Amino acid sequence: MIHSKIKIAFFDTKPYDRRFFDEANQNARFGFDIRYYETRLAPASAKIAEGAQVVCAFVNDDLSAETIRTLHDVGVELVAMRCAGYNNVNLTEAHGKLRVVRVPD
């Protein structure tokens, strides 16, 4: 059976983010297909995540109800926050559509 690589769309990334995640992704346990976007995640930018199973978002990204619906519509299954907070995530809208995880406090 052939397993395809998990595709991750990283939003609001800087060069230092890319270096860190690319280095970590070299580990044989990972090998994800990573796409980086400098733009922040918002309703207008959410469609560029199409084709990714996972979105990695940051503290200033907008995960409002509209963004969550768009991510769900384009096939995203998981939002991984690169921060401890998640007050920018509409968890009510995400329920039943996307899983949301974050770094521990």
Predicted regions and their residues:
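N-terminal glycine-/charge-rich "phosphate-binding" loop or analogous flexible N-terminal tail
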Residues: 1-52
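Phosphate/diphosphate ligand-binding glycine-rich loop within oxidoreductases
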Residues: 52-105
